[in-house]
UniProtKB/Swiss-Prot annotation:
The keyword S-adenosyl-L-methionine does not apply. The keyword Lipid metabolism does not apply. Palmitoyl acyltransferase. Its main location: Golgi. This is Probable protein S-acyltransferase 14. Residues 127-177 form the DHHC domain. Pfam families: DHHC. It catalyses: L-cysteinyl-[protein] + hexadecanoyl-CoA = S-hexadecanoyl-L-cysteinyl-[protein] + CoA. It comes from the Eukaryota.
Length: 307
């Protein structure tokens, strides 16, 4: 019964192939929302307030500095997700072995027998994609939208027109983080102007600027609330070292092979260098000493198989 339910849940993803037609339209939509917001906050309301003098100018300057900083970080993170390949399986990839610890080649073990006819295996390091006709590492999944296997695939995101996987998952999380902060800021600073629409006082401005302010407030409020939900969900996934796909696959499993504790789970996504935690990038040292950032190998609990 559980197997049937899982199959029904995953059949939904066959409709994701229709997402290919969206293409760069979603990127233009994101930039359009940014443009409307920029016009409402900077050009219509708080830019002109800089010339008023006194505390009004100081407050406007503070808001504009914070707004531009968050906007810069948002766009940096966003385009990092868009233009960074999430990670693909190298040609002729084979799982590594540790001869010093007495490990044998998984391809020569009984786990590999019949692998090409069954994508599941008792050895999570040995899996086969019948669509790509190649071996794939653990935590790797085939994306029906991109038509390829993606390392540590989380999901295919229509907003970034790209898969979110091992090599750009951190950038996606930072995009959510800075989007939430930016949209929350815009909602708060435009709220007095939005409330003024429902008062009896005369509101200065042209119909165009007033409509832009109204639209920007509604859009940013909607995005702030929706992104907050996604951000909370992904914080929970990072804490358990789980992807969105894996959360569906193991929804009845209480123990998880890759859950090494919140600190190590966090570092597997954001790296060990704290200076880079809020920046869409990694240090060369982290890339060298943390192979899991490359998406091919992930440490698991030493005693997991004996539990």
């Amino acid at each position: 019964m559980h197997r049937s339910g899982t199959t029904m849940a995953w059949n939904v993803f066959k409709f994701c192939t229709a997402l290919r037609g969206l293409g760069s339209i979603m990127i233009l939509l994101v930039l359009g929302v940014v443009g409307v917001t920029y016009y409402a906050v900077v050009l219509t309301n708080y830019g002109p307030a800089l010339s008023q003098g006194g505390l009004d100018s100081l407050a406007a300057l503070t808001i504009l500095i914070l707004f531009h900083f968050l906007l810069a970080m948002l766009l940096w993170s966003y385009f990092s997700v868009v233009f960074t390949d999430p990670g693909v399986v190298p040609p002729n990839w084979r799982p590594s072995t540790d001869e010093e610890r007495g490990e044998s080649d998984p391809l020569n073990s009984l786990d590999f027998v019949g692998l090409q006819s069954d994508s599941s295996s008792s050895n999570p390091r040995v899996r086969f994609c019948r669509k790509c006709n190649q071996l794939k590492p653990s935590r790797c999944h085939h994306c029906s939208v991109c038509g390829r296997c993606v390392l540590k695939m989380d999901h295919h995101c229509v907003w970034v027109v790209n898969c979110v996987g091992a090599l750009n998952y951190k950038y996606f999380l930072l995009f959510l983080f800075y989007t939430f902060l930016e949209t929350t800021l815009v909602t708060l600073v435009l709220m007095p102007h939005f409330i003024a629409f429902f008062s009896d006082e005369e509101i200065p401005g042209t119909p165009g600027t007033l409509a832009t302010t109204f639209l920007a407030f509604v859009l940013n409020l909607a995005f702030a609330l929706s992104v907050m939900g996604f951000l909370i969900m992904h914080i929970s996934l990072v804490a358990g070292n789980t992807t969105t796909i894996e959360a569906y696959e193991k929804k009845t499993t209480t123990k998880w092979r890759y859950d090494l504790g919140k600190k190590k789970n966090f570092e597997q996504v954001f790296g060990m260098d704290k200076r880079y935690w809020l920046i869409p990038g990694y240090t060369e040292e982290d890339l060298r000493r943390m192979p899991e950032l490359q998406g091919l190998e992930y440490p698991s609990k030493p005693d997991f198989d004996s539990q």
